[in-house]
Amino acid sequence: MKLWELALAIGGAICLLLGTAWIRRSELPRKDFVLDAGICRVPVTEYDPPASVSPAGSAIVLHGLSANRRVMTYLSEDFAGHGLRTYALDLPGHGDNREPFTFPRAQLCATATVETLIRSGTIDPRTTVLVGHSMGAAIAIRMADREPVLATIAISPAPMKLPMRMPANLLVFTAQFDIPPLAKEAKNLEAAAGGARNAPEDFAQLRAFDLERIPFASHTSLLLDRRVAHRSELWAMRALFPDVATETLALNVDLATYETFNFGRRRLAGAVLGLIGLVLVFPLAASAVVQLFAQIFRTAKNQASSAPAADLQNDPQINSSNRMPGRALILVEGIVSALIGVVVLILFVPLKFLHLYSGDYLASLLLIYGALMLILNRSAARATFSLNIATKVAAAALSVGTILAVGAWLNWQLTDGWLNAPRWLRFCALVPVLWVFAYAEEVVLGPVDSGWRRLIRFVFALALRLELWLVCVFAYYELMSGQVLILLLVTALAVFSILQRLGTDALRRRTGSAPAAAFFGAILGAWLIASVFPLT
């Protein structure tokens, strides 16, 4: 344990406490339940306005592909904080919904849920707003043919067959960095609606339309964008109160009780601050876990404390005959291996039995890529391999603790980080697959150095990941792979890759074991794929 690790851990604990306080201060009444809607069982979270605020209407929030109702927490609580009782749904195959996902089934269950809420008198379609993102936005728009409501807000809608009639009071958002098919869909909706109409009489006659282009935003960042939340709430208020001046409604949205007195804007900041706190605590946790299991195994084997110490401090030395090729050659090997992988996946997907929408494709690609990279660098792979049990157990304990801690925090405010039973089964199947990929990465990256060499190694690791993603982009546009979800998740995959590499390097530096570091990275990667991609 080092002084800087202790200092970071103290800072992390402060971040966690402060983040928790901010979230608690701004929390609204909420309850979770499962709604029986015909043949669908849909998990729902209901967010109520502050106790002193009488609901002006209702909002139904629909998430996008590979998301869940917790991803929509920021928008859901913001709508509730401004006087709309809000219902966020988990569509089939997403979040807590264990039913298999297909696009038609997602639309069927979303529509059935709205119909059930209307029939039960829970919501009134004359004061209800549909809010959707990506796939959820497309479903909300197409719902106009079955369940017309007061207004619809479509955030970066997915490509769709347009409904027979346009939804009433439709607001569409598109991001500056949206992928071309999504940007094109927004323009198609604008053309179908006949351009912008946002006068008070347009809202009164249920024909208002506007297209908002958000600069410096991506497909996923729109969900956490204050501009999107503010303009969405103002649009909903204009639909609910068309006779009230827009300036008055805007002032009401800006100075709403929830924002002014309950620090609603700190909600998201608190969630992010908590994640930063967990990152700061990690170095101390890694050192403590490695030292603990090293001591346990020394005691169990009745050995001198210095005997296994070398295995916990230094990577095995690779002699000149087994030396790795240069980084430029490794990048070429990576591109070739990834291209071979996407070509093979045109013929068949080896891990199709996992039944994870796009997740089985990604896992299969990583398996093929990892196997080819190990074959190309087999001498270094043999020289790097070790069977020290203490390091593997330490890696397993640290990785499981990490996904439980991070998953619990994410599950509270940001996304569904807890795995249900079907996802745990897929997680177990993914770990050995991801170990092949992770070990190939550790082999080609080599031992963790210090100073500038460590930074260069880190950038090189991210370059290898970027290569893989760019090959997936190539496969989507040129080979018609259909795996658009991997493109849409670029932000999440980038953030995960950075944090996973930092954690894996920290463990490898403390254990000196490439296989143990790969085991740690594999467990984190398996958790990501099992938790994010929809069940089919």
Task: Please identify what each model-predicted range represents.
Residues 1-7, 325-332:
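N-terminal membrane topogenic signal
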Residues 2-36, 43:
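An N-terminal hydrophobic leader/cap segment in hydrolases
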Residues 4-11, 269-279, 427-428, 490, ...:
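Alpha-helical transmembrane segments
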Residues 17-21, 283-287, 342-345:
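Alpha-helical transmembrane segments of multi-pass membrane proteins
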Residues 27-262:
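Soluble extramembrane regions of membrane proteins in the secretory/endomembrane system
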Residues 52, 300-324, 524-530:
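Intrinsically disordered, low-complexity terminal tails and inter-domain linkers enriched
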Residues 246-304, 318-330:
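Cytosolic-side membrane-insertion boundary helix
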Residues 310, 314, 328-536:
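Alpha-helical transmembrane segments of integral membrane proteins
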